[in-house]
Amino acid sequence: MPSFDVVCEANMIEVKNAIEQSNKEISTRFDFKGSDARVEHKENEITAYADDDFKLGQVKDVLLSKMAKRNVDVRFLDYGKIEKIGGDKVKQVIKIKKGVSGDLSKKIVRLVKDSKIKVQASIQGDAVRITGGKRDDLQSVIAMLRKDVTDTPLDFNNFRD
């Protein structure tokens, strides 16, 4: 029986490239001259450092523009609160969402069941497995999910025939 998985994960290689490009632009921009503005990446979180709130906003704008150019959906980012660190400097931790949350997976299963398409949806950890008799049914489920779930970027992978 054909099946596929619905997941929510960013392309970490492109995220890393966007961060490196952001740091390169920040180091060469005139308005950041002499400041300690930078972006760091550790596993599933990004930390933005700057001298004040205004420059932190500019650092985030640079990061978001570089991510958009590299086709990384910015809906993967979950912003933490702005923290003050030594002196006048500030930082903000930005978490990268990974996996389909419990509420979203229940919503996906409910949408699939309410659609009356002859497929089954089951929650498997941080992914939702959709299984059906025909490939056409699976393609119509993908189209329906892309239309109805707009708050989180979904990826469809692990296709089996």
From Swiss-Prot:
GO MF term set: nucleotide binding
Pfam family, any one: DUF520
Source organism, top-level taxon: Bacteria
InterPro entries (alphabetical): DUF520, UPF0234_N, YajQ-like_sf
Record key words, sorted: Nucleotide-binding
A GO cellular component annotation in the UniProt record: cytosol
HAMAP family per UniProt: YajQ
Cross-referenced NCBIfam families: PRK05412.1
Similarity remark: Belongs to the YajQ family.
Main function: Nucleotide-binding protein.
UniProt-recorded name of the protein: Nucleotide-binding protein Bxeno_A3642
Species of origin: Paraburkholderia xenovorans (strain LB400)
